[in-house]
Every structure is written in structure tokens, then in C-alpha cells.
């Protein structure tokens, strides 16, 4: 992250306060951030540190004295009965220890639960009925969005409690639902939503509640405001709230101070698997009387804190755009970044997908941008901070010539393609794909070796790897007897690979591992003779996939037959006896004793369809430890849940 502001004087302090207020307005009020969370947090803490050293200079407008944002003119104002406080953020174990020492909290009992990344909402119930819903706003006053709250299915319109109670929580969008929304917006030619948090906030504040209803928002309760329950502990209050019919997350722990670090690390490991975006863990003193004793600062409760996760979204600068040519000839733009570290990984590049995406983002070279990285997925650009341009930016031009071979490119709109079948990049990437683990799995034949073999004129197409000789390899730099023989042995071992792997390795557009497996299972050695209708009618296929395969076979049939005669791929038509899993839909979740891919392959061998999400159509959920929300949904829907022990018992019946 660039160091955009150094606070070493009253003037630089006031500039920093103004910058933070502008960023906060964009984030809270406009739902259009112009800085990343990490960038805001870093500058916020610099301002706070300056104020602690120079209290007399503290501005009345400093964000360290305020909570959240203001109120949009599109909604009427409404006051919370009890103030909705923000939480203090901490970012390390040392800060956690310091927080525990303040107020002598070391020997207390705590509740630990996820900090979901969404939009806070306060629900007021009177005599069992939902009467008002208010956004956080500035903590005192928010926007009344009652009509929109009523169309969120996870918010009960009535509850079995007659008293007056404010139930607070986070409005979020599940990752899968967010992706589905953007897919639909892409089809409709609409601007894509930048991330689930902004999507949730924007959806909650729609003037048309019909739009809110379509967004599949989820309300996750995390506390109460006004209440007369007479309960002694926060954990008891939350059990009461969830028993009223509100969403119940599976991570909710009551523990002492010694267990907090372990709980944080456990939750951090679930970050990518969770259905909903999390950005930390909330730690709260469980004893409500002790909470009252600890009290509040001007902004934060002293009895709770947000232990933030390492940022997966950061601000950096787009230095350039590199062009990559794939095996199908598609030219893909890749953003070259000023290096940043995200969750321990050094990030120098980000996907830009295609040139239509560049135009949609409106991004230029040397722009400040926000990037997000999740798991091992290639980072992507989520925001462009156009308001912070300084005149050094230059436009990104659609290419007309292949960056590898110089051929004139075919511009089809979304895709720009090199049509030269002998283009170096196309050839090399085709061979890399063929030799990869998910295809023919030729150990030792990686990108560097393939490039070397190509440069020396030893290979120019996939089939050439089967003509390599010992003396060819020994003539190359870095090869000795053992390395050369090992590579030849690995190439020989690829012969007889499964037909599904062979088809995957050919690299036909739209035909991946799953599709190749279905082609092999249904057509066997006659797969090249399958007609359009037969392919189109396979489960999960359609006209686009069938056309792609037919066109690929028509152009490359002679080459495929020659390669197939050397590899002689094996195949086995599916002969599945009736069993507990045949024809069933199965979801795998949690940590299991064997790799998930291994169990998935075994289930598919029994005729099961392994899917990624739980629905009413799911027949089994195979759950390991730390199973998460998929297990919870299975229980709610009445789907049969089995553990590994029951899985093994059911297999014995096959």
C-alpha cells in the first residue's frame, strides 16, 4: 500500500481528517468507496496517534469522535432507542493482550463470533410485531428502511415475545448469491456490483423494495439494544434471539481469555469456506453487569472489540497492462501492479478478464485501484479511485496485433483472438495444459522445460512429446542421465491414461474435467463419432458446449486420431449397480480424513452427483469437522446428514 499521507503537522493532520471524512462519506452514505478498508484503517490510526500526542489540536470533525455515516435524503430519519455503537478494531495478538489489560478483563468469560462484512440494521419489535427497521447511520439516527426489511426472508415479521426489543444484526449477501446477481447483470449489460458488502448496503437502501426482495439478503443477529429480558449474559440473550427464529451461525463460542487466540485462528481458517464474507472476530464480555461497569468511550464500548483478519482487499497502483495469449488464442489483459502483500502473499498482478471489463471499470494506467484476493484465486480489481487521479494516467488501448506472433487479431467484442494456429504462445500453452496434473499428469514436463523444448525445435505440437529421444534431452542445458530418463518414463507412463483425462488434455473450449468425464462415460471409444444432439442432451450440456466440441473435432480430428493411437486411452462405460448413492445429490462439507477430491471421485463412481450447495433437492450431506453453514442449512431443510462412519457403512451395502 502506498503511504499517501504523513501526519507531522497541524496542517497535515487537518488534511488527513478531511480525507477520512470524504472516504467515510463515500463508504457509508454513497455506497461507493474511494479507499480500501485497510487504507482507511491505517490513516485512521495515524490520526488517532497524532491526537493522543496533540490533544489540544483535536478537530471537532475528527472521525475518531463519530460513528458510521449520515442519513441519505432518500429515506426518512429515525432515532435508535439505544445508541448503536461502533467497535474498536485490533489487528494483532499484542493489541488483544493490551485490550484485555484495560479494565482488567483477563479473568472474565467472553463470547467470540464472526464479524460479518455487511450493513448494520436495527429491528424494533413491539407486541411481537416488526414495527421499524433503521440503518446504523451515525449511531444515534439512521435511515428508516422498514419496507425493505419486510421483504428480507430471514427477518421474522412477528416473534413470540410481547415486550419491546431492538434486535441488531448485519445484512449480508452470500457469496454465491452475489456471484449470481453479477452474472445476471452481465447478461443485462448492467454495471457489476463491486463486492458483497457494498451490494448488501445498496440493496438495503433501494427506494424500490421489489429490488431488495430480489437480492436474497440475509440478516444475521449479533446483539440487542432496548430490551427488558432480565438475562445476565450476552450468550443467553443471543440464544433467546436465535430461538425466536433468527439465523443461527455455527461459530459461537463462550471461552476465557486464554482461548481467544485459538478461536481467532480457527475462524480465520474458515474464512474462504464460509458462505458469507467475514472480516474478523467479535470478542465481547459475556457478563452484562460487567459490561455496564466497563462502560463506553466517546465512540466505543469498552467491553467488546473487533479482532480484524489480515486484509484481503488493498489499495495499490496499476502500473501497466500485460497481454497473455492462451491455448485457444484468446488475448487476456493482466494488470501489472505496484507490489502489495495480501494475507501473506506478495501480489504483483491482477486479472482484468477482457477489454470489455477494462472499459466497464473505466480503469487507466497509473490509476489507484482496490484489489481483492480470496484463497488461491488470482486477485481481481474491485474499485477504481477515479477521484484521486493526478494527471499521470493514460488510457489502455485494445490491441490489434498479437503480442507473441504479430498476427492481426480478431476482435469479437468481449474476446480478442489470435487466429494463428502456429502462434508460439498458443502451442506452448496447449502443451502445458496437456501435461498438467488434471490432464495427462506428465511429471517433470512443466512450463520451463516445454519452453526450452520449443525453442530448440524439438516440439511444435502436443504429439511431438511422444517422439522425444534420450539423446535429444541430453543435449539440453540442465539435463543429465537421471533427469532425462525420468522425463521419458513419465511421458511413457501417460500412455493408457483415462479417456476423460485425454479429452480434457486436448483443450477444447468449454469442455473441462466434468464434461470430459461425461463424454467418456457415455460414448467411450466412439466419442469422436457422437453427433450434435447426443452431446447436447448430456446432463449439464447444451448447444454452446455441443457446438464447441463438434467444431473442435471437425478441425482437429486427424491430429486427435494420431495422438489417440499413441496414447491408447483407457475407458470404462458406467455400469453402476443400484446403491445408496446412485442417482443421488451429495454435498461434501467440513474437514474429512481423506482429500475431498478423492471422496468426490469415489461418490461419482457410485453414480452420485456431487454438488457445491445444499438445497431441498440434496439427498445427502457428508459432514466432517467444522462443517459450517452447509450443515446448518441441511438440518433446517431436513436433508439427511451422514458422517464418515455412516458413509463407510453405506458403502458396505454396495
From Swiss-Prot:
Co-factor requirement: Mg(2+); Mn(2+)
Enzymatic reactions: NAD(+) + (deoxyribonucleotide)n-3'-hydroxyl + 5'-phospho-(deoxyribonucleotide)m = (deoxyribonucleotide)n+m + AMP + beta-nicotinamide D-nucleotide
Coiled coil: none
EC number: 6.5.1.2
InterPro entries named in the record: BRCT_dom, BRCT_dom_sf, DisA/LigA_HHH, DNA_ligase, DNA_ligase_AS, DNAligase_adenylation, DNAligase_N, Hlx-hairpin-Hlx_DNA-bd_motif
Class of this enzyme: ligase
GO biological process per UniProt: DNA repair; DNA replication
Pfam families, A to Z: BRCT, DNA_ligase_aden, DNA_ligase_OB, HHH_2, HHH_5
Record's keyword terms, sorted: DNA damage, DNA repair, DNA replication, Ligase, Magnesium, Manganese, Metal-binding, NAD, Zinc
Domain BRCT stretches: 576-654
HAMAP family hit by this protein: DNA_ligase_A (MF_01588)
Family: Belongs to the NAD-dependent DNA ligase family. LigA subfamily.
Name of the protein in question: DNA ligase
Organism: Campylobacter curvus (strain 525.92)
Amino acid at each position: 500500500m502506498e503511504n499517501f499521507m504523513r501526519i507531522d503537522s497541524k496542517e497535515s493532520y487537518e488534511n488527513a481528517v478531511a480525507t477520512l471524512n470524504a472516504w467515510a462519506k463515500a463508504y457509508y452514505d454513497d455506497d461507493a468507496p474511494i479507499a480500501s478498508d485497510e487504507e482507511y484503517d491505517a490513516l485512521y490510526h495515524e490520526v488517532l496517534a497524532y491526537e493522543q500526542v496533540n490533544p489540544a489540536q483535536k478537530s471537532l470533525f475528527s472521525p475518531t469522535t463519530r460513528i458510521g455515516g449520515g442519513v441519505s435524503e432518500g429515506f426518512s430519519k429515525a432515532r435508535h432507542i439505544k445508541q448503536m455503537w461502533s467497535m474498536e478494531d485490533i489487528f494483532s495478538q499484542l493489541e488483544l493482550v493490551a485490550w484485555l489489560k484495560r479494565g482488567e478483563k483477563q479473568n472474565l468469560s467472553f463470547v467470540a463470533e464472526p464479524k460479518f462484512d455487511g450493513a448494520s440494521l436495527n429491528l424494533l419489535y413491539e407486541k411481537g410485531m416488526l414495527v421499524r427497521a433503521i440503518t446504523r447511520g451515525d449511531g444515534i439516527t439512521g435511515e428508516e428502511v422498514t419496507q425493505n426489511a419486510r421483504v428480507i426472508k430471514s427477518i421474522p415479521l412477528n416473534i413470540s415475545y410481547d415486550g419491546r426489543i431492538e434486535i441488531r444484526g448485519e445484512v449480508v449477501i452470500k457469496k454465491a448469491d452475489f456471484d449470481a446477481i453479477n452474472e445476471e447483470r452481465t447478461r443485462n449489460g448492467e454495471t457489476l456490483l463491486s463486492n458483497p458488502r457494498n451490494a448488501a448496503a445498496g440493496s438495503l437502501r433501494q427506494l424500490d423494495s421489489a429490488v431488495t426482495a430480489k437480492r436474497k439478503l440475509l440478516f444475521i443477529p449479533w446483539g440487542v439494544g432496548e430490551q427488558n429480558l432480565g438475562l445476565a449474559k450476552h450468550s443467553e440473550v443471543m440464544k433467546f434471539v436465535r430461538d425466536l427464529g433468527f439465523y443461527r451461525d455455527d461459530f459461537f463460542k463462550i471461552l476465557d481469555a486464554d482461548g481467544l487466540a485459538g478461536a481467532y485462528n480457527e475462524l480465520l481458517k474458515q474464512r474462504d469456506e464460509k458462505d458469507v464474507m467475514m472480516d474478523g472476530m467479535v470478542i465481547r464480555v459475556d457478563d452484562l453487569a460487567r459490561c455496564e461497569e466497563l462502560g463506553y468511550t466517546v465512540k466505543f464500548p469498552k467491553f467488546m472489540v473487533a479482532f480484524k483478519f489480515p486484509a484481503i482487499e488493498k489499495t495499490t497502483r496499476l502500473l501497466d497492462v500485460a497481454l497473455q495469449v492462451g491455448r485457444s488464442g484468446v488475448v487476456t489483459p493482466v494488470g501489472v501492479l505496484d507490489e502489495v502483500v495480501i494475507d501473506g502473499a506478495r501480489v504483483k498482478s491482477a486479472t482484468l478478464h477482457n477489454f470489455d471489463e477494462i472499459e466497464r471499470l473505466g480503469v487507466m494506467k497509473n490509476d489507484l485501484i482496490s484489489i481483492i484476493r480470496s484463497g488461491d484465486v488470482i486477485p481481481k480489481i474491485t474499485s477504481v479511485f477515479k477521484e484521486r487521479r493526478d494527471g499521470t494516467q493514460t488510457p489502455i488501448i485494445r490491441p490489434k496485433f498479437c503480442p507473441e506472433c504479430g498476427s492481426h487479431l480478431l476482435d469479437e467484442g468481449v474476446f480478442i483472438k489470435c487466429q494463428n494456429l502456429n502462434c508460439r504462445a498458443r502451442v506452448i500453452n496447449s502443451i502445458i495444459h496437456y501435461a498438467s496434473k488434471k490432464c495427462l499428469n506428465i511429471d517433470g514436463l512443466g512450463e520451463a522445460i516445454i519452453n526450452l523444448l520449443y525453442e530448440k525445435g524439438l516440439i511444435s505440437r502436443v504429439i511431438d512429446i511422444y517422439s522425444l529421444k534420450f539423446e535429444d534431452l541430453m543435449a539440453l542445458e540442465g539435463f543429465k542421465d537421471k533427469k532425462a530418463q525420468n522425463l521419458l518414463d513419465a511421458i511413457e507412463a501417460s500412455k493408457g491414461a483415462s479417456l476423460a483425462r485425454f479429452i480434457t488434455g486436448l483443450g477444447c473450449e468449454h469442455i473441462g474435467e466434468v464434461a470430459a468425464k461425461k463424454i467418456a462415460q457415455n460414448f467411450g471409444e466412439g466419442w469422436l463419432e457422437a453427433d450434435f444432439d447426443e452431446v447436447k442432451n448430456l446432463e449439464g450440456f447444451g448447444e454452446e458446449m455441443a457446438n464447441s466440441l463438434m467444431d473442435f473435432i471437425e478441425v482437429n480430428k486427424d491430429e486427435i486420431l494420431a495422438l489417440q493411437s499413441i496414447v491408447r486411452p483407457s475407458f470404462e462405460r458406467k455400469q453402476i449397480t443400484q446403491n445408496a448413492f446412485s442417482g443421488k445429490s451429495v454435498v461434501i462439507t467440513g474437514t474429512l480424513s481423506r482429500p475431498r477430491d478423492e471422496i468426490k471421485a469415489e461418490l461419482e463412481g457410485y453414480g452420485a452427483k456431487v454438488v457445491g450447495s445444499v438445497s431441498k433437492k440434496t439427498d445427502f450431506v457428508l459432514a466432517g469437522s467444522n462443517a459450517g453453514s452447509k450443515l446448518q442449512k441441511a438440518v433446517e431443510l431436513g436433508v439427511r446428514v451422514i458422517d464418515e462412519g455412516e458413509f463407510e457403512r453405506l458403502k458396505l451395502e454396495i
